[in-house]
Amino acid sequence: MEKEGLAKSSDTSIKKEGFISQSLSKDGIPNQSLPDDHIGIENISVEPNKLYEAVSNLRNYGFNYLQCQGGYDEGPGKNLVSFYHFITVDDFQKIEKIKEVRLKVFLKRDSDLSIPSLYKIFKGSDWQERETYDMYGINFIDHPNPTRLLMPEDWRGWPLRKDYIQPDFYELQDAY
């Protein structure tokens, strides 16, 4: 069941809300449950303007480690997606007891591609957000160093987008 105002995923499966999605809803954060992944991890979509609030709540629920942040392109004319994989980490926790959740933010390609940086909550998001910016052009508001990480600063375009057109030339540089 899709909630009003949330960007649509290309996956049209209807999913019953999971526990974390229900908790976010109870805390007043609009979200949409997406189908669980192949190993049963709950996937949730949130609006860009609610990302920071949703992640703050996840941190309060015990999800204290950002395991991975990245992006992907659903295809030409479709959404760009920023995803976040959170886990619980505890000194005395058994590996089979680790809780996991994945948040996704769907951004329309022809709209504003800006979302809040999570650097203030998770310092480890620094280079991950920079790489996502570098490869997909998703801007992270309030990031402390919003520069390219892998490509030269003067590079044009976003190489991992599916509509990216590779330049016909490469400028060779002297080794001296």
Curated annotation (Swiss-Prot):
Regions crossing the membrane: none
Main location class: membrane
Q: Name one GO molecular function term.
A: quinone binding
Catalyses:
a plastoquinone + NADH + (n+1) H(+)(in) = a plastoquinol + NAD(+) + n H(+)(out); a plastoquinone + NADPH + (n+1) H(+)(in) = a plastoquinol + NADP(+) + n H(+)(out)
Topology relative to the membrane: Peripheral membrane protein
- Where does the record place the region Disordered? 1-32
Q: Which InterPro entries match?
A: NADH_DH_suC, NADH_quin_OxRdtase_su_C/D-like, NADH_UbQ_OxRdtase_30kDa_su
Q: What is its EC number?
A: 7.1.1.-
Q: Which UniProt keywords apply?
A: Membrane, NAD, NADP, Plastoquinone, Quinone, Thylakoid, Translocase, Transport
* Protein's job: NDH-1 shuttles electrons from an unknown electron donor, via FMN and iron-sulfur (Fe-S) centers, to quinones in the respiratory and/or the photosynthetic chain. The immediate electron acceptor for the enzyme in this species is believed to be plastoquinone. Couples the redox reaction to proton translocation, and thus conserves the redox energy in a proton gradient. Cyanobacterial NDH-1 also plays a role in inorganic carbon-concentration.
Protein family per UniProt: Belongs to the complex I 30 kDa subunit family.
Q: What is this protein called?
A: NAD(P)H-quinone oxidoreductase subunit J
Its gene name is ndhJ
